[in-house]
């Protein structure tokens, strides 16, 4: 057995993840020592990797692309947020041996936009690009902030329409998207391989904030495109990452970290 409480992030890829550094900063705030690692699970091997992790003393896990919807099905019970999202980014090991699934992505995104970037969501028009687990995970919390309108656009229109029906929002084909959006959020994973969403530069003409859910170099192609196309402000997903991580940490340990100094620490690395 491991002497320290042990946590990890599961993804494919996982080597780029900054989650270990973030959670170590939270542990410093709490005044405890923890282990936090990266686990690159094979496609098709996620459930076994999670099972092995918890059976060998794991206490909690974060889940990133492409496993968030698989994590939902793996969990034995779910929070209301996870049920609404149909996707899980946080797994909590319970004392009776069951696994609880939660979704803190929406909290991380909304807190970063409203509290760190100081842009209200209420009354705004929002465009979501992508229809995977990451996007589905943030819609319930975005709706709680009462935007005037949420539109979802995806390369595969059927997936966008499925989410639109589920959450009572609008869906349009990516190629048909025009301007008129205050906040544009990229939830596609194309940036990880340098690809841009297939949208017109015109969509950014009224944009107050263009936001990419990924961070660092992976966000650069989309944010450069948005900036050059007229977006007034751009942001990568580092603040969202720190915010969702803080909510996960609180679920595992009952300690709520202060995210602002951790965001600044991560920017300085």
UniProtKB/Swiss-Prot annotation:
GO terms for cellular component: cytosol. Pathway: Metabolic intermediate biosynthesis; chorismate biosynthesis; chorismate from D-erythrose 4-phosphate and phosphoenolpyruvate: step 4/7. The keyword Ligase does not apply. Shikimate binds at residues 17-19, 64, 89, 105, 215. It holds the Pfam family SDH_C. CDD domains: NAD_bind_Shikimate_DH. NADP(+) binds at residues 80, 130-134, 154-159, 213, 237. Homodimer. This is Shikimate dehydrogenase (NADP(+)). It comes from Neisseria gonorrhoeae (strain ATCC 700825 / FA 1090). The lineage of its organism: Bacteria, Pseudomonadati, Pseudomonadota, Betaproteobacteria, Neisseriales. The gene is aroE.
